[in-house]
Amino acid sequence: MSRFKRGAHVDSGAGFRQEKEDCPVPYGLLKAARKSGQLNLSGRGLTEVPASVWRLNLDTPQEAKQNVSFGAEDRWWEQTDLTKLLLSSNKLQSIPDDVKLLPALVVLDIHDNQLSSLPDSIGDLEQLQKLILSHNKLTELPSGVWRLTNLRCLHLQQNLIEQIPRDLGQLVNLDELDLSNNHLIDIPESLANLQNLVKLDLSCNKLKSLPPAISQMKNLRMLDCSRNQMESIPPVLAQMESLEQLYLRHNKLRYLPELPCCKTLKELHCGNNQIEVLEAEHLKHLNALSLLELRDNKVKSLPEEITLLQGLERLDLTNNDISSLPCGLGTLPKLKSLSLEGNPLRAIRRDLLTKGTGELLKYLRSRVQEPPNGGLKEEPKTAMTFPSQAKINVHAIKTLKTLDYSEKQDATIPDDVFDAVDGNPVANVNFSKNQLTAVPHRIVDLKDSLADINLGFNKLTTIPADFCHLKQLMHIDLRNNLLISLPMELEGLIKLRSVILSFNRFKSFPEVLYRIPSLETILISSNQVGGIDAVQMKTLSRLSTLDLSNNDIMQVPPELGNCTSLRALMLDGNPFRNPRAAILIKGTDAVLEYLRSRIPT
């Protein structure tokens, strides 16, 4: 007999009710379903689901009248609970409350119908793991859907949904979510609670941005945001370490996203945007990339750093404004497909372009060996060449305004690294992943142009006061160091927009941060911060992202709820009791609302 209790759903005549003779579902199908636990009614032109389907495991079947012997071969009373029900490609306009009469359902597929609503009782299907509702006319979902906490796969594509409530964050076991082809204008920050999500499709909506909290989805492998209205990608997207496929086609992007932590990214699709420039900073971390699609953009040239993509197999540059190619492109060992149609290439003969990728790469390789007037041959090292200079990309300094001396495991930055700047304006400095115990004093040489500095993954214990001379700084990354405080002189950084202090040794929130009104992002997770001053925090009127997760905060001040500029507030992993976890998983808006409700009146 079934393991599910049915008493609550059985009426007094259930045992004597006969299945209707005019049921549009063949009796043989129902009989087989009782044995197999599966029923496929797809493509049968149904305008409604017969009651006999919902009551499949409740009513006494017809064969009971014909055979009541316990010794019979057809043991009709030994039925299996229905676990899989397929109703796709019919003409259903509604699903009745009786759907709750199938509590053992694991798979429910109702795609390609005419549904405009669902009953709230769908939330009673506690065993449901896969719910397919695509290609219908749904404008919203009942609250019952968000009670399906065992759900692993939810398909809602091709509907008319305009908003997803923050209750989405309750579906913590989801590993696949498809919201494509709807009318969504934003996504709730509670999406970040879906820590098991592997595949997320948001394509073909009206999204202008992604919630910063999306960076917390550490298991996400595929993200599709194609055909939206996004002009930029939040920097925190770079923290998605498991991402393998990223689709950003048909948006309004002007630059490739910087993805320094996406070490496993294999496919990056950015076609049909407004990208004009490719910079070394966008390419150097994409070591695992096998496919880069940039067709139908406005790219004018390829940097020499394209050769950093040693795993690249396919490069699509169709319909851009490229007039020449770096000869180093021919040295990429795995490149099998290079699409260049629709570019004003003048330096390469047309007949060569028609011979295919292999011949073109062979030609480019042959040009690498030509004399320096081709601009490609490296200058030989001499006895006067310092070892550190051999590691510096001078081309990046001059053309990309980037000084990169990262991942060298050096305890100091040699002077000749700064000498290589040679008066050129530098906007980006990356000294991360070394063994630095102090900030190089010559960093102030770059004070007139430096906007972004990365000193993460070192052994810094202090930040010098003369850091305040870097008046153009907009972004500081100090993650994974040994810092316990910041100097008050940093309040002079009037252009600073983001600071990353995660994985240090702060025991209190740095007082100076309250005095930098330009701040938009503060990430100080995984420290030992014991509390925050909500009144001072409110003075940061531009602050939109505040990550305080994994600290020692015992009490969250209710006044923090008045920081209405916050769009992403991360508090998980702290020892406080309130707000409770049930509030936290609902997202930033719910947390702020809860905190405001606790303010004494």
UniProtKB/Swiss-Prot annotation:
Determine if Repeat is one of this entry's keywords.
Answer: yes
Gene Ontology annotations of biological process type: intracellular signal transduction
Q: Where are the LRR repeats?
A: 33-56, 79-101, 102-124, 125-148, 150-170, 171-193, 194-217, 219-239, 240-264, 266-285, 286-308, 309-334, 336-355, 397-420, 423-446, 447-469, 470-492, 493-516, 518-539, 540-563, 565-586
**Protein's name according to its UniProt entry:** Leucine-rich repeat-containing protein 40
Q: Does the record bear Oxidoreductase in its keywords?
A: no
Lineage, opening ranks: Eukaryota, Metazoa, Chordata, Craniata, Vertebrata
Q: From which organism does this entry originate?
A: Danio rerio
Xref: InterPro entries: Leu-rich_rpt (IPR001611), Leu-rich_rpt_typical-subtyp (IPR003591), LRR_dom_sf (IPR032675), LRR_domain-containing (IPR050216), LRR_R13L4/SHOC2-like (IPR055414)
UniProt cross-references to SUPFAM superfamilies, sorted A to Z: L domain-like
Superkingdom of this protein's organism: Eukaryota
What are the record keywords, sorted? Leucine-rich repeat, Repeat
